[in-house]
Amino acid sequence: MPEHNFLVVEDSPTMRQLISFALKRIPGSKIVEANDGIDALKKLSTQKFDIILTDINMPIMDGLKLVSMVRNDPAHKTIPIIIITTEGAEEDRKRGLALGANAYVPKPIQTADLLNIVNQILEKKG
């Protein structure tokens, strides 16, 4: 069974738990959680991830800055990124995708939609 390493970046403990719980349905999943973009960058420096899932609106460093920094880092620029933000935050969605995010999931999160997007990305990665 292949192993899939996910980095979940979300400042809300409840949302982090919900996303992580959904990802655990994928066989071989290993989930690491981060509270904000700075915490995520620290974890990226010591671990390898298959997909980053990040909220956009967070304190300290938001998800858009995180997407930009990951895309400009040669060691991590190819890691797929899924941005998660409040439904209707069209400007955030557009900016996130323009910065290099691979996909977008609106809040409130529908588990089936999240898993479909994650599985599509994993299939493309091979």
Q: Where are the model-predicted features located?
A:
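Acidic, metal-coordinating helix/loop segments flanking the phosphotransfer/catalytic sites
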Residues: 33-51
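C-terminal output helix
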Residues: 109-118
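Receiver (REC) domain active-site loop signature in two-component systems and cognate sites
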Residues: 58
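Two-component/phosphorelay signaling modules centered on CheY-like receiver
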Residues: 13-32
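Active-site T/S-Asp motif of two-component receiver
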Residues: 53-55
